Amino acid sequence: MNQCLSYILLTMVLAGATSKECHAQGAPSDREVDRSIVRALKYLASQQQRSGAWQLQNASRGQDAASTTSLAVMAFMAAGHVPGEGPYGEAMERGIRWVLDNQRPEDGLFIHRAGSGPMYTHGICTLMLAEVAGMVDPSLSDRVRKSLERAILLILQAQAVPKGDRHAGGWRYHPSSNDSDLSVTGWQLLALRAAKNIGCDVPAEAIEYAVSYVNKCSDRNGGFSYHPNHGVSPTRSGTGILCLEICGEHRAPTTMAAADYLLRRPLRYDDGFFFYGVYYCTVGMFQVGGRHWDQTRNHVTSLLLSRQHPDGSWNPSDGSEASFGPNYATSMSVLALAVEYQYLPIYQR
């Protein structure tokens, strides 16, 4: 009897370990994903400049070092590291200070060098500050909060610029833009939601207005497009899903139609803006949960781990993100792979 009971208990333990370790036959185990993240963070730490920044390979595509630095800081946070503590704490703190130093005094815009799309950079930097605000040393906390308040005000002012009905509620490349797209809107909405979550003054009406724009970009057959009625894609569908999920539209019909679309047409490595897409699709489908997350998790981890370089990096060597370089791609990959840790507040279900 005792031998039988011992066998049953051992079988249950092994079954539980197998279930935790292997999400699907052929998909990377949790340990393999963990090791991949560790290698990626070591790579990122080796690439930080003396100034505290992480540079883009080429700043001509509308992003700059401020956005890449913010993504790198969030990548460390997503893996459980805290500014000012542990092996990467000092590097993270230097990165945060560098971003703060690159906020324009006249209007609060984050920008390191001129580019065609400064609102991309601004949204990413604002999101990062909202995520670290409660984790930084008290000596830095007040500065982060004041910077965040100015950054949020600029986002709200940019949303309020008069736009036609098709574009109302969203954002585009510049604070003064009178049109919108889902890509820029996604970063601003994530930033506002994260800031509101920590008690910043973000009117509910601004969130609702932005959600109304996101819904305009949805397709009745499932998925989201760059502009309303522009043609759906996996990358934009991930953006739409995440935006709606974090704004209270959990598993809403529009969200689920897009999630079903992503199961039918999952993200591919040769898709335009793959690393942008892998972040949004992964985090968005994690929020949806259930079979949608299970299938996405297995697909994305297999895809990313097979493309990781021996030094721990990912490098968009060709295509739409080729000029962004490995710091950007590696940060986005870690943000996708680390979603199940739920260390970043925006990741929490």
Q: What does each model-identified segment do?
A:
Residues 25-42, 50-91, 104-208, 216-260, ...:
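An alpha-helical repeat/solenoid feature that recognizes helix-turn-helix modules
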Residues 18-24:
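Sec/Tat signal peptide C-region and signal peptidase I cleavage site
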Residues 6-17:
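Bacterial N-terminal signal peptides
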Residues 1-3:
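N-terminal secretory signal peptides that target proteins for export/translocation
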